[in-house]
Amino acid sequence: MGPYSLDDIRHTFSTSTDFNEIFDVFQAALRQKIDDVEPYRLLFWNQSLTPDEIRLFGEKLAAEFDTLAYDVYLWLASVFEVTSSSDDNYELALHYYMKASAIRPQEVDPYLDACDCYDPDLNIPPLMALVDFLRRGVDTVPRPDILYRRLAQLYDLAGDSDRSDWCRRKADEQGGTPAGGAPPVA
């Protein structure tokens, strides 16, 4: 089979409901060395694909183009965060935020985005898994005060005021006042 045009690839990724067709076009895109994340985003949002199929494509893409891996993992996380039809999807979102942070540990976005997907009513992803993730991040990001502030919020949700207060103090020591210049709320 000959090469596909970028328009053909986009069209298939966004509209096809046939897994075999999508897979064939995906394989062709890899052979053609298409390393622009944009058409693959369409693939990740294809409603006909199961979470396992989306993961298959995303993992293969990240392995094939290591320069795209960080963006691929962030996109996979956001897809699973938004498609919260099952509790597992929240945990998949956290899983991919963790993979993104492993590639670029100095980036704060995976940590903050993971916190944003937390649902306190359902405790998904598990609160303590988020806490552990952020605690690892404070040693790698250039502005740990940002993560300490989020940790303080998470500890508040867990009812642990001592650790919450400690994190607020660490945030103040590390970075001064929060974004916007306002003092922290007591």
Regions found by a protein language model. Give the residues of each.
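N-terminal leader/linker segments that initiate helical-solenoid repeat arrays
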Residues: 1-25, 29
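Helix-turn-helix repeat elements of alpha-solenoid scaffolds
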Residues: 13-20, 45-57, 86-92, 122-128
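Inward-facing hydrophobic residues that define packing positions of alpha-helical scaffold repeats
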Residues: 23-27, 58, 90, 97, ...
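Structural signature of alpha-solenoid helical repeat scaffolds
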Residues: 64-65, 85, 102, 122, ...
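TPR/TPR-like (Sel1-like) alpha-helical repeat modules
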Residues: 94-102, 129-143, 152-179
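Acidic, Ser/Thr-rich low-complexity linear motifs
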Residues: 150, 180-186
